[in-house]
From Swiss-Prot:
Membrane topology: Peripheral membrane protein
Ranges annotated as spanning the membrane: none
Protein family: Belongs to the glycosyltransferase 28 family. MurG subfamily.
Catalytic activity reported: di-trans,octa-cis-undecaprenyl diphospho-N-acetyl-alpha-D-muramoyl-L-alanyl-D-glutamyl-meso-2,6-diaminopimeloyl-D-alanyl-D-alanine + UDP-N-acetyl-alpha-D-glucosamine = di-trans,octa-cis-undecaprenyl diphospho-[N-acetyl-alpha-D-glucosaminyl-(1->4)]-N-acetyl-alpha-D-muramoyl-L-alanyl-D-glutamyl-meso-2,6-diaminopimeloyl-D-alanyl-D-alanine + UDP + H(+)
EC assignment: 2.4.1.227
Record-listed UDP-N-acetyl-alpha-D-glucosamine binding positions: T11, G12, G13, N124, R164, S192, Q314
Compartments, record wording: Cell membrane
Organism of this sequence: Deinococcus deserti (strain DSM 17065 / CIP 109153 / LMG 22923 / VCD115)
Protein known as: UDP-N-acetylglucosamine--N-acetylmuramyl-(pentapeptide) pyrophosphoryl-undecaprenol N-acetylglucosamine transferase
Gene: murG
GO MF, one annotated term: UDP-N-acetyl-D-glucosamine:N-acetylmuramoyl-L-alanyl-D-glutamyl-meso-2,6-diaminopimelyl-D-alanyl-D-alanine-diphosphoundecaprenol 4-beta-N-acetylglucosaminlytransferase activity
Primary role: Cell wall formation. Catalyzes the transfer of a GlcNAc subunit on undecaprenyl-pyrophosphoryl-MurNAc-pentapeptide (lipid intermediate I) to form undecaprenyl-pyrophosphoryl-MurNAc-(pentapeptide)GlcNAc (lipid intermediate II).
Class of the enzyme per the UniProt entry, highest EC level: transferase
């Protein structure tokens, strides 16, 4: 069988689709290798998932100052291409798959310079900068959306957003995470790297609406699978616990602010399969990967889109989830006034169950398999 290289990295939105597709290709007998930034998140994820990894240098193509490229980043990008060429010449893959983001660029450009076939996956509704650089010489582009701005009509193949299609029982997931099995579980995540804004705003909002005891007043034990031990006998409120993935660099800032709340669990990094399986409700940004994982696990969302996302794509992502009945959108500028009310609305049992069904209906089951099919179509015939 063939060796397929996954050029990926930077954020979970680029990395986890590569992991899901690599696993699918492995199951079909192919060998896979993740190629990304040396020392990046992708190196850690590959080790955790038992996948082979090679690291190279990588430079962000962001612009600084008066629209001039940062020469240091350009140098790193060029050096990364040189290093990636060495890796590909040594490993001789049949095909390289690019998942977008600056960390994928060295591998994709190196492959194209060596005449190795490339296939791309675009996770957003707008073709990213790295993909725009590479798309002209790519054999095919798999997409998560029917229409992708910047990609000529008919040049993309809708495959969906590959996610790790693994499910745990709620009880097993909560056991692994050290959570109680009774309370309503709220998962807070600002993407794979965390979100400074959510880290600053969510703890105070949840403290305000849940109080020191962590209770949703007025919902009672019907709000979730509540053990009597977690229902306050006087307030009659439903017990809540929070799992907040802050991102490693911000844990030290968030943890002291919630240390007095027994129901609030701040962690730097969490296994997202377990976290989604444990969650009854989540407060998140609106990256495509996050929304796809929530849909697969049937988790209702309160979404705070990143306003700086290109073409405001996170807002439009979130709006599509809300229109499908699977969540609520709270714009960042309105968080102080609206976030608490949105959480209370989505925690109401009838609303939450309806949103869960709507989320499951949005799930693009089998995306990794469909993308693997597309990749196999472009493997050289032996």
């Amino acid at each position: 069988m063939s060796l397929v290289v996954m050029a990926t990295g930077g954020t979970g939105g680029h990395i986890y689709p590569a992991v899901a597709t690599a696993r699918e290709l492995n199951a079909r007998g192919h060998e896979t290798l993740l190629l990304g930034q040396r020392g990046g998140m992708e190196e850690r994820v590959a080790a955790e998932q038992g996948l082979s990894f090679e690291g190279v240098d990588a430079g962000k193509l962001a612009r600084s100052g008066q629209g001039r490229p940062d020469p240091r980043e350009l140098f790193r990008a060029v050096r990364g291409v040189v290093e990636a060429r060495r890796v590909l010449q040594a490993r001789r893959p049949a095909l390289v798959v690019g998942y977008g983001g600056f960390a994928s660029l060295p591998g994709v450009l190196a492959a194209q310079s060596l005449g190795i076939a490339t296939v791309l996956h675009e996770q957003n509704a707008r073709l990213g900068l790295t993909q725009r650089v590479a798309v002209g010489r790519a054999r095919a582009v798999g997409t998560a959306y029917e229409q992708v701005l910047g990609l000529p009509a008919g040049e993309g193949t809708l495959v969906g957003m590959p996610v790790r299609e693994e499910r745990l029982s709620r009880e097993e997931a909560q056991r692994r995470l050290g959570l109680h099995s009774g309370p309503l579980t709220v998962f807070v995540m600002g993407g794979s790297q965390g979100s400074l804004f959510l880290n600053n705003s969510v703890p105070d909002t949840l403290r305000n609406i849940l109080g020191k005891e962590g209770l949703l007043s007025g919902l009672g034990s019907e709000a979730g699978q509540i053990d009597l031990d977690f229902t306050h006998p006087r307030a009659g409120g439903a017990a809540v616990q929070v799992l907040h993935s802050t991102g490693p660099r911000w844990l030290a800032d968030v943890a002291p602010r919630v240390h007095d709340l027994e129901w609030y669990h701040a962690v730097g990094y969490v296994d997202t399969v377990a976290a989604w399986a444990a969650a009854d409700l989540a407060i998140t940004r609106a990256g495509t990967g996050t929304l796809a994982e929530a849909a697969f696990h049937g988790v209702p969302l309160v979404m705070v889109p990143l306003p700086e996302s290109s073409e405001n794509h996170q807002y439009h992502n979130a709006l599509s989830v809300q229109q499908a009945g699977a969540g609520r959108v709270v714009e960042q500028k309105n968080v102080q006034e609206a976030l608490g009310a949105a959480v209370l609305e989505c925690a109401e049992p009838g609303t939450r169950m309806a949103m869960r069904d709507a989320a499951l209906a949005r799930a693009q089951i089998g995306a990794a398999a469909r993308f693997a099919d597309l990749i196999e179509q472009h493997l050289p015939r032996s």
